[in-house]
Amino acid sequence: MFQRLNKMFVGEVTTSSSHEPEFSEKEDDEWILVDFIDTCTGFSAEEEEEDEDIGEESSAEHTSVFSCLPTSLECLADTSDSCFLQFESCPMEESWFITPPPCFTAGGLTTIKVETSPMENLLIEHPSMSVYAVHNSCPGLSEASCGNDDYNSSGPRMEAQSELGTHIHCCVAALAAQATFLEQPKSFRPSQWIKGHSERQSLNRNGLRRQNLTRDCHTRQMKHRCWAVHQPCPRQYNY
């Protein structure tokens, strides 16, 4: 194994040393043109010559290109239409089958038939999305079909009306609750507040003490007025 690797490396060195290196530059336009049709025709011409010499056994070894392709591309093998491209048999061992798009084949004059997947036209739609609803307005339809269409079209309308009714009911309930909350301070009178405040204050210890003191002071003043003569106070300034 190592000897083979040595020979490979030594052989490359000798060949590179015997020939002078040639540098060539190619302008690349970011596109690579693959002449696959010419290569296939070249391979087919060689196979025809070999078939004349060898026979039918060699022709059985080279299978058609379309035998190894999936079922979606089997329509390419139909040679009945002359306007489509036709690929002849060529060996597919360790190679890729390149099919350029139609706009790059012969200036867009020829096209390649490719089967479209049914999932491409699939539209996943939510039931609440009524934007894509198709209303059939053909006059030639029967009355029964028109009645069914009217019933089906009125279904979303009824649902929308019921949703609108529930929304309005919720708004009315919220407004009523807010109105009752705002009317509570208006109905609250100051007399009720004074009465409740006095009741709460009467139960307090300090409040009871103040009431007792006011009563005592009032009784003492009444007794003093009964037996004592009230004299006016002296004037501070003489006018």
UniProtKB/Swiss-Prot annotation:
Recount the UniProt induction comment for this entry.
Answer: In chronic pancreatitis tissue, expression is suppressed by camostat mesilate, a serine protease inhibitor, and by Saiko-keishi-to, a herbal medicine.
In terms of InterPro entries, this protein maps to: TP53INP
Instruction: Identify the residue span(s) of motif LIR.
Output: 25-37
GO cellular component entries: autophagosome; cytoplasmic vesicle; cytosol; nucleus; PML body
Membrane spanning stretches: none
- Write out the annotated subcellular location: Cytoplasm, Cytosol; Nucleus; Nucleus, PML body; Cytoplasmic vesicle, Autophagosome
Give one GO molecular function term. antioxidant activity
- Supply the alphabetized keyword list: Activator, Antioxidant, Apoptosis, Autophagy, Cytoplasm, Cytoplasmic vesicle, Nucleus, Transcription, Transcription regulation, Tumor suppressor
GO BP term, pick one: negative regulation of fibroblast proliferation
Let me know which tissues express this protein, per UniProt.
Answer: Specifically expressed by acinar cells of chronic pancreatitis tissue.
Q: What is known of its domains?
A: The LC3 interacting region (LIR) motif mediates interaction with GABARAP, GABARAPL1, GABARAPL2, MAP1LC3A, MAP1LC3B and MAP1LC3C.
**Record text on subunit structure and interactions:** Interacts with p53/TP53 and HIPK2. Interacts with PRKCG, GABARAP, GABARAPL1, GABARAPL2, MAP1LC3A, MAP1LC3B and MAP1LC3C.
Function in brief: Antiproliferative and proapoptotic protein involved in cell stress response which acts as a dual regulator of transcription and autophagy. Acts as a positive regulator of autophagy. In response to cellular stress or activation of autophagy, relocates to autophagosomes where it interacts with autophagosome-associated proteins GABARAP, GABARAPL1/L2, MAP1LC3A/B/C and regulates autophagy. Acts as an antioxidant and plays a major role in p53/TP53-driven oxidative stress response.
* Name of the protein described by the UniProt record: Tumor protein p53-inducible nuclear protein 1
Native source species: Rattus norvegicus (Rat)
Underlying gene: Trp53inp1
